[in-house]
Amino acid sequence: MITANSFERTIGGRKLVIESGKLARLADAAITIRYADTELLVTLCSAKKPREGVDFLPLTIDYEERMYAAGKIPGGFIRREGRPSEQAILAGRLTDRPLRPLLPKEWRNDLQIIITVIASDKENDADIWGVVGASTVLAMSEIPYEGPVGASRIGYINGEFVLNPTFAQLESSQLDLVVVSTRKAVVMIEAGSKEIPEDIMINAIEFAHKANQELIDLQDEIRAKLGKEKLPVPVLEIPEEVKTAVAAFVKGRVNEALSHQDKTARENAVEGLQAELVAALSETFAEGDILAAYDKEIKKAIRSTILEKDIRVNGRGIKQLRQLDAETGLLPRVHGSALFTRGDTQVMAITTLGSLQESQQLDGLSAEDTKRFMLHYNFAPFSTGEVKRSGSPGRREIGHGALAERALVPVLPTPEEFPYTIRLVADVVGSSGSTSMGSVCSSSLSLMDAGVPVKKAVAGISIGLITGENDTYCTITDIEGIEDNYGDMDFKVAGTRDGITAIQVDMKVKGISFDIIRDAIYQAKEARYNILDVMDKALAQPKTELSPYAPRMYKINIDPSKIGSVIGSGGKTIRSIIEQTNTTVDIENDGTVVIGATDEASAKKAIKIIEDLTKDIEAGSIYTGKVTRIMTFGAFVEILPGKEGMVHISELADHRVEKVEDIVKVGDDITVKVIEIDNQGRVNLSHRVILNPNAVPISRNRDSQPRRPGPFRPSDRSNS
């Protein structure tokens, strides 16, 4: 048996075990990390040589879910794992975002961390353990790394914080918060919440940071025993003579180029100055060094103006929002639409409503099987005036869409209140920063324009950060793209007037203090109120009527014991209803039936069929049915779907009838009255009392009158 190094802790009342040396022994570093009965294999491999022609850290983090982990066989034709699920992509981003700032920017060797979920107890989410596992293999490896980090999930249930809540606990939690932090600072925050107040959110982040310390202690213990000697950080210095020459050439001109409020004018001015600079110095210095030095001059100009003058490069104040505009009812025919504009950033959001049958089917390790609310974010290259490949959404688009989706979920009506599947598409048509928060604003308005009865409007804002010497800093409201590029943080907060619904924090520095976190959260609250004021002017309440082009959903309730009658053998009956009426039919286990139709007549037709299928035949009631069979003694009539009664020959007319066929034939419609339901549940009908209401129906025993002729027996001849 292969021996392994094993390290244990008890975290949140469950056992955490990290082992190394048993699996993936050819990787540069590898561990398994198990929390309760959820287990992941985490590996790190690094290229031996730097990659040529790159000016960034080539880090790739792949998060892979194995369906066997939960005892499942993958769906689809080939029955094997294919492209990562949306949840897997988000889990990969959750790991990448906090680790990247802690690795040297100068590192050019390819790094690949693969996180594979190999066991899932369906109670504990694996995503945060991917973060802890990735941090552990980096700490063990020879890669320079300013970690380790701890990652904790925090719930808020009945006024108490819960460390690493289970899926079941999250159902009743007001908060789903993930915090990643080093020993001293927070490096990543991600949260979804049900309008949590700002002070509770800050306390939850502090609670998580304290919980992370035990995970950091554990990784330090592993590193002390198994860690390799770290490689030196590569030195990528710009020659001093280049920096001096560039600074002298652009002195005073960089601030002038950056001062344009219009994004296009600003970019043209910056690029024009760059072209002049390269033309003047390229014969003396390498172009790459010139461009790197110029980039540093731009960064210095942006940051110094903010820190020293409290003014941003385009003249805006530290807390000043860009020009805002909101519009609804933008497009014809669609179910709901809105456009939200913030400076040069524009997001158009379209709402489409469908039946619950159109919910997304999830094939992954998440606790949910279906999803009735989807927000899809698209970022077209024309939004930045560029020519790029346009294709399927990447990780960034999926992440931005998930954030906006998370921000809106707390205000959505329940399926019982609004039995629709809701799809939102947020199309970015102009981008100068903060498109994800623009998507929240436009999507909130689009839902209201579609008549979705959301509880409140939701707005989002990004808060940036500029840090200086001696722990000085400045938080800035509503960052533009250039401030995001050259700043230190993107602190996104979405919420209503009553609290926070989502947070996502990314940073380029190696962590932020709680003073910065508090300033950012309260600064975002002030800005959010101002944005909601503008949104309210466009549309303050959801429309009371749906679009005439949206499907209508009608809800009825049936006896749960009659569900089988509606579905039929192998679904035959319900398929027939859908085909006959051109509707959709969803049935819940409690007997709730939701019928979706494009017109009222189709819905009413489907409702009548379902009600007839589940209705009990009552004595004295009158029905119009169809003749299904004819016997010598009478006719059988289907008076409700699948339910027959018999009209005796003497009850077919108000005169003597010689042959049943003289009055009715198979397929004829006939109105009858239920005159008796005998002790065996058989239904006797009369057409005679319909023709003559004063006629008295005859009660008869049908035991001697079988529904179908019986087989010939010798005794029949002797009785004749």
UniProtKB/Swiss-Prot annotation:
Q: Name one GO molecular function term.
A: magnesium ion binding
Which Gene Ontology cellular-component terms appear in the entry?
Answer: cytosol
Where is coiled-coil annotated? Answer: none
Renumbered residue ranges of the record's region Disordered: 697-720
Instruction: Report the principal subcellular site.
Output: cytoplasm
Superkingdom of origin organism: Bacteria
Instruction: From the UniProt record, list the reaction(s) this protein catalyses.
Output: RNA(n+1) + phosphate = RNA(n) + a ribonucleoside 5'-diphosphate
The protein's name is Polyribonucleotide nucleotidyltransferase
Species annotation: Dehalococcoides mccartyi (strain CBDB1)
